Amino acid sequence: MKKRIFLKMSSAALAGAALPHLNSCKQVDTPVAPQGGQAAARLKNWAGNLEYSTGNVVYPESVEQAQAFVMKADKIRALGSQHCFNRIADSPHQLISTKNLNKVVALDPAKKTVTVEAGIRYGTLGEYLQGKGYALHNLASLPHISVAGSIATATHGSGVKNGNLATAVSGIEFVTAAGEVVTLSKEKDGDQFLGAVVGLGGLGVATRVTLDVRPSYQVRQDVYENLPFGELEKNFEAIMSSGYSVSLFTNWQKNNVSEVWVKSLIVEGKPATIKTELYGATPAKRNLHPIVELASENCTEQMGAPGPWHERLPHFRMNFTPSSGKELQSEYFVPFSNAFAALKAINGLGDKWIQDLFISEVRTIAADDLWMSPCYKRPSVAIHFTWKQNTDSVMKLIPVVEEQLAPFGARPHWGKLFTITAAQLRSRYERYADFQQLLRLYDPKGKFRNDFLDLNLA
């Protein structure tokens, strides 16, 4: 998940230079100025660690406009809500932002689906669905991210039975390199649909998405403090199954998990069974931020207060608009069966990053059949790192983390920082070659390719 930890520390403590060079972590091409004049000011991502390689950005307000922009361009790349930490959405030539394609197209109660434009944000969609009595199966920790961008990178929430956000997709519409509008559906397009959903922006510009919905539901959120790390060895599955969505937060110090966030469904007529202690962790006495020292007013309500799904499943409130946050993020997915071994390997590194790590979050995600999803064919545990913008130190630590997780076939989050090579990715994704072929099918001349795809899908 490309999540926002709303840090409230001094600018001196958080200061870090922007990183115009980050790809997965490689150099990008020389930026190309728009034709006919001086280059426009360039956008940055929301964390401020990355400046995009061109100020040549177009903002279609209709599918027809998107088609026209794509047909006119020699090279172009789709840009979502700018929440990625690497250059997956970058291009030195031209960017096409879907921020103005942000409406609900149709709600179909009979099929239990909602069709939306690509740039709508999950928080906005959540409010709409709740007003109609419907819900999505899960949300990421930050509700401000766009639907199409989140799907393209397999962004996720938590829950042992919950797939990532892309698993809710039943149909997708995108503009191809030829300017044609293609619609693929789970019902009609089978394997090709499964390859296209987590498309990494390589098949075209997503314009509409159809998502499965369900009746609205209520959730309560309870937080526990100070879970002994050793309890994870025998009780990891029980702990992560103690709610509909469970997250662990730790800085890997003192063999301690500082917080356990348990989000539980409220079933009408069935009293909630909330534990007075959770394998040695005790209930928090107040609302908490994932970093316990920080103020919690931007976090979703805790202390067991019932609320609608879209106000409890995220960690942070929709009505707080995030500003640029001085942080870096990386995340790796390992098989659920290797959970404790992987966590133990990382826990042993804790002393290496005392000065560089804000917090880590551990979540679970159900297996899926989407080709480029990090959870393809395996129930997974996601180990996330929110780093300080100590760029030089962090970029040395990331390969150390990857080395420890390599025995478990760790797959990186596509929108966060990693140095795993294309050869390693190829060995860890069964459908890697099939996806390369799918890219060539829809984009034979590489109109949507960029350095990120060239590096990681060589």
Where are these regions (language model features)?
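C-terminal substrate-binding/cap subdomain adjacent to the FAD-binding core in PCMH-type
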Residues: 2, 32, 170-349, 355-356, ...
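Structural signature of FAD isoalloxazine-binding scaffolds in flavoprotein oxidoreductases
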Residues: 86-106, 157-179, 205-212, 381
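Substrate-recognition/cap regions that form aromatic- and gly/pro-loop-enriched pockets
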Residues: 313, 317-424
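Activity-critical C-terminal alpha-helical subdomain
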Residues: 408-458
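N-terminal secretory signal peptides and thylakoid transit peptides that target proteins
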Residues: 1-20, 24-28
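Short glycine/threonine-rich loop-to-helix capping motif typified by GTGT followed
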Residues: 17-20, 260-265, 303, 307, ...
